[in-house]
């Protein structure tokens, strides 16, 4: 069985909780369909970003973020009055190290093959990634996340 990994931020009376789910991919083709991306990210427009292998330090411990492809809602900041950072996805995206942009909403993790198709992970790969993400999530409380304001810049031609 092949899996994509879904990162969610759950907001309730106790605050926010980061959730990591292995999602079985029952696709007819080996790639992850655009329809599946829309459904899992709960949106109509997705953005896709490849992230290289990264080393991050939390509390003096080194953590490894494997090379992954992030699939996320392109318009989340425009559709929500009070967007909440998806902290785990934001760390993978480079928040606090490469830039100050948070990701919000559900974020799908997969990998991209040589043809540029989004592909699910094998069960072993998915388990290893979940283990890495769990370790990083244990230290994520050390960071402060500030969601950027939505901005649109119009350019004249």
Annotate each PLM feature.
Residues 1-157:
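Short beta-rich binding modules
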């Amino acid at each position: 069985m092949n899996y994509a990994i879904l990162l969610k931020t759950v907001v309730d009376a106790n605050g926010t909780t980061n959730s990591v789910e292995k999602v079985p991919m029952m696709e007819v083709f080996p790639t992850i369909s655009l329809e599946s991306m829309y459904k899992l990210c709960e949106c109509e427009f997705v953005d896709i970003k490849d992230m290289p292998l990264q080393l991050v330090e939390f509390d003096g411990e080194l953590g490894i973020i494997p090379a992954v492809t992030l699939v996320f809602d392109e318009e989340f900041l425009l559709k929500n009055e009070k967007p909440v950072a998806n902290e785990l996805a934001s760390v993978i995206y480079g928040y606090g190290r490469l830039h100050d942009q948070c990701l919000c909403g559900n974020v799908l993790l997969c990998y991209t093959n040589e043809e540029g198709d989004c592909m699910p992970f094998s069960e072993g790969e998915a388990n290893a990634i979940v283990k890495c993400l769990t370790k990083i999530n244990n230290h994520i409380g050390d960071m402060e996340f500030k969601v950027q304001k939505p901005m649109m810049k119009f350019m004249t031609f």
